[in-house]
């Protein structure tokens, strides 16, 4: 009996702090959120006739200044050029600056980000992007392709675009990726990209549709709902 009482006392001593810690802190949400397959399909259907479309379904308050978004993304067939390929295509057309990752007018109007380099390597990839305050977790649901990840942004331009529903918030883009690696992503694969890490699509033979699970800190408007699924 004494041993039983001791075990109960020890269990209580362990569990009570855990239960107290598990309680939502004041001001944090106390309810869960459901996003149905029907809602996801409804948003996805509006994207299928576009080259690239990325929309969040909802911005959900998850407490302590964090929000969680579910991105629904469609990309049709595409192939990204290297700096060398773009320069060859642009030779003689007066668009060499764009081949290096940007153009003079845009560079003059925006704040540079990433490393600035007059002549990036020929194998650098166009379309590099990073997000300042958002992690992305891709889950491929249809199609697939070759993504590029990691490395550094060269000749980027800072984006402060931050509409209520995202999709991503401020970041660095418009430049080229140096030192990235390519990865194949197909149905069922998952890619997790922390804030500040380069990601993009190098080659999509037909299309790719994916869900992006996006915890963000301090950049989205909690409670925002995509107009396509918002209650009228």
Predicted regions: what they are:
Residues 147-148, 193, 199-204:
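Short beta-strand His + acidic residue motifs that chelate non-heme Fe in jelly-roll/DSBH
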Residues 1-10:
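Bacterial N-terminal signal peptides that target proteins for export
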Residues 188-189, 197:
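Structural motif
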Residues 127-130, 136-139, 182-183, 190-191:
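His/acidic/aromatic-lined binding-pocket segments of jelly-roll/cupin-type domains
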Residues 21-128, 223-232:
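A short, N-terminal "cap"/entry segment at the start of jelly-roll beta-barrel domains
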Residues 131-151, 162-173:
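Short, conserved beta-strand element in jelly-roll/cupin
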Residues 9-20:
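Bacterial N-terminal signal peptides
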Residues 24-47, 100, 119, 158-169, ...:
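Double-stranded beta-helix
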